[in-house]
């Protein structure tokens, strides 16, 4: 009986640990993405500037966690093992633990010829791989996306259940360790994690941008291969199961808010037709339904489109601000401030499926161009801000240029 009573007390304490109690401390998170970028395979300027940028974040005594929303190089740079390891080596210098979700440029788009992959030859029905001066394939595994994702996992997620670096190691819950037993293949997604800080649940999802959730046929082939179709289907289903798991945990722990971290800007047309973002609808649907059921602030961070933006694309006509030039102060979204290639200035109209989720907010992190910057996110358990351009619920944020 005594042991049973003790078990009940411990279980209650565990539940309270995630709750919105007054004892939760205020914390600060640095959010970055789409960096270091190069304008060509030989442009190393941002890569060489990265250690100083990391040090600038380290020098902020408030920061206790770093998030990277994906893309460790540009779409004009090659996918090599040496480069992936070099960036990982730089990240070891972060004083705070780093949580990273992969971007399209380091795996899903590695097949592209401009990234050193190759191109489909209609005459032969085979792939003409990009070769270096010695006749060797430029990219790791010839740019095969699945192989490059495995490479990223082997470097950045070699220790499942642990964040990257930091002077004090941080544990996370990985889908590789906590997958649904009914779907054992989900254990492959070591990059999908969740964890809690100050009564806020954070969750990452592997959703690559720029290619309609990796459905653009690899190497420019006429249609997706069986391997590509399997990749897309398995990852998408695993993502949605993981998102549901995270929200279930947030609700059972009475967390005060949820942060979602992924790479794709699912509302950016990027110069293509609206049909080129349809494969993201499944994730938007899942986010919208889970956020609505949760009923508390849900904040999404993404990269991909490179320009700082703050809005709520799950509400038609919601306020929106956008960076009008690299480093410029954000201005209201309209036809003058939003590039035409992006689509409608109201992001809801790029995915207009009847969403009405007032407790949601999205921030696209500045990336790609200089001046380099990071987003300083403060989580104050005592705050309850209205949904605005730079604050929502326990969150407030500002752009920082070192």
Residue ranges of model-derived segments:
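Active-site environment of divalent metal-dependent phosphoester hydrolases
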Residues: 38-40, 74-76, 105-111, 211-215, ...
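C-terminal motif of bacterial Sec signal peptides marking the signal peptidase cleavage site
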Residues: 16-18
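Bacterial N-terminal signal peptides that target proteins for export
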Residues: 1-8
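Extended active-site neighborhood of metal-dependent phosphoesterases/phosphodiesterases
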Residues: 78, 82-234, 316-379
């Amino acid at each position: 009986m005594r042991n049973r009573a003790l078990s009940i007390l411990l279980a209650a304490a565990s539940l309270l640990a995630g709750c919105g109690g007054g004892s939760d401390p205020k914390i600060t998170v640095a959010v970055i993405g789409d960096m270091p970028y190069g304008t060509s395979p030989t442009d190393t300027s941002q890569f060489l500037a990265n250690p100083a940028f990391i040090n600038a974040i380290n020098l902020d005594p408030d920061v206790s966690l770093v998030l990277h929303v994906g893309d460790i190089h540009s779409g004009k740079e090659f996918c090599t093992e040496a480069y992936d390891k070099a960036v990982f080596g730089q990240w070891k210098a972060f004083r705070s633990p780093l949580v990273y979700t992969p971007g399209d440029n380091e795996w899903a788009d590695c097949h592209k010829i401009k990234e050193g992959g190759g191109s489909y030859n209609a005459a032969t029905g085979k792939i003409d791989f990009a070769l270096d001066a010695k006749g060797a394939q430029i990219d790791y595994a010839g740019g095969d996306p699945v192989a490059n994702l495995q490479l990223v996992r082997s470097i950045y997620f070699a220790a499942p259940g642990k964040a990257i670096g930091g002077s004090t190691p941080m544990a996370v819950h990985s889908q590789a360790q906590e997958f649904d037993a009914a779907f054992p293949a989900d254990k492959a997604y070591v990059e999908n994690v969740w964890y809690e800080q100050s009564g806020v649940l954070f969750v990452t999802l592997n959703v690559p941008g720029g290619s309609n959730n990796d459905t653009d046929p690899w190497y420019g082939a006429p249609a997706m291969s069986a391997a590509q179709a399997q990749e897309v289907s398995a990852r998408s289903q695993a993502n949605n199961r993981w998102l549901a798991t995270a929200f279930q945990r947030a609700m059972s722990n009475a967390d005060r808010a949820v942060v979602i971290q992924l790479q794709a800007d699912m509302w950016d047309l990027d110069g293509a037709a609206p049909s080129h973002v349809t494969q993201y609808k499944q994730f938007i649907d899942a986010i919208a339904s889970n956020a609505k059921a949760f009923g508390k602030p849900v904040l999404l961070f993404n990269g991909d489109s490179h320009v700082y933006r703050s809005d709520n694309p799950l509400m038609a006509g919601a306020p929106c601000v956008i960076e009008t030039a690299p480093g410029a102060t954000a201005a209201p979204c309209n036809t003058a401030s939003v590039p035409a290639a992006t689509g409608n200035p109201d992001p809801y109209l790029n995915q207009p499926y009847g969403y009405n989720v007032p407790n949601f907010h999205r921030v696209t992190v500045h990336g790609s161009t200089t001046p380099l910057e990071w987003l300083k996110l403060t989580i104050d358990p005592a705050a309850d801000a209205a949904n605005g351009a730079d604050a929502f619920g326990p969150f407030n944020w500002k752009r920082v240029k070192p």
